[in-house]
């Protein structure tokens, strides 16, 4: 007798990461081109010496460091094996049957529909607005008696667009208090909206028990290979997250690197500013070439190429630069270092390429 596997799993698509190819420039996975901060690299080496010991299952030291950094209590912070693991755990603690609905904009983070179906819940996708941003009014209007969870990816992956604080607060005011709203801020460190409008989810959600904020050390901090992210929210939600947390899933090296990165965060601004300079240079060059490129608050830009997306991705790969096509929606291009960006522009801004794909 063969094992009885859930039949619905056969319809779940595998998560598709950005491609890798030796010798090619990889602008497909939103990774930083720089290694971890020096203090983090040192902490990684030291922590590796203790790899024969189990890590702190509660990530107590890291939670305390984050609580101090964010101005919250330790009880408001949970740690996960990357913020995507926390996304799945949030579905687990809110949804218990296929009648339960998880709302999110589309297109948005590719993992949302996957983890929703894995969690045996129903995904409800709300189309983006014409400017490739979350349609917050439509998202609020899509809430039903079955809605349990809403993911708001801000800035949005893969389109790079972001809503300011005022728009987010209006949206949150429209959502029933029993529906959990997740502000997924994986690219928070790259946002450069005005100080008055910059949507710090921790501040926005400070007096809203139904708001949880997710951030990660994978992007700006350069720890993508170590898998460590965190959630900030009401103690009741955090307690539930820690109940479904897979024991020891945040390893010792990841915890040490994250703590060291926080302690050296003053070094991060120079790195993120360099990315932003290149982001704007890349976008301006693509606009000048004739492409439609929405403003980005992330470490990538979005080319809404529609049906040409896959073909553009293959042509770029043939030119030695890997980018990330998304079906028939568009192509996401990570901001690399100046040399890598120039290689991509030599391909994309070529008049023959523009005429073919624009």
UniProtKB/Swiss-Prot annotation:
InterPro entries (UniProt xref): Aminotrans_II_pyridoxalP_BS (IPR001917), Aminotransferase_I/II_large (IPR004839), ArAT (IPR024892), HisP_aminotrans (IPR005861), HistidinolP_aminotransfase (IPR050106), PyrdxlP-dep_Trfase (IPR015424), PyrdxlP-dep_Trfase_major (IPR015421), PyrdxlP-dep_Trfase_small (IPR015422)
Keyword Transferase applies: yes
Modification N6-(pyridoxal phosphate)lysine, positions: 219
Keywords: Aminotransferase, Pyridoxal phosphate, Transferase
Annotated catalysed reactions: an aromatic L-alpha-amino acid + 2-oxoglutarate = an aromatic oxo-acid + L-glutamate
Entries under SUPFAM superfamilies matching the protein: PLP-dependent transferases (SSF53383)
Entry's Gene Ontology BP terms: L-histidine biosynthetic process
Cofactor: pyridoxal 5'-phosphate
The keyword Transferase appears for this protein: yes
Enzyme Commission number(s): 2.6.1.57
Pfam annotation, one family: Aminotran_1_2
Molecular function terms, GO-annotated: aromatic-amino-acid transaminase activity; histidinol-phosphate transaminase activity; pyridoxal phosphate binding
Enzyme class: transferase
Role: Aminotransferase that catalyzes the conversion of aromatic amino acids and 2-oxoglutarate into corresponding aromatic oxo acids and L-glutamate.
Subunit structure, as described in the record: Homodimer.
NCBIfam families reported in the protein's UniProt record: hisC (TIGR01141), PRK03321.1 (NF002878)
Similarity remark: Belongs to the class-II pyridoxal-phosphate-dependent aminotransferase family.
Official protein name in the record: Aromatic amino acid aminotransferase
Upper lineage: Bacteria, Bacillati, Actinomycetota, Actinomycetes, Mycobacteriales
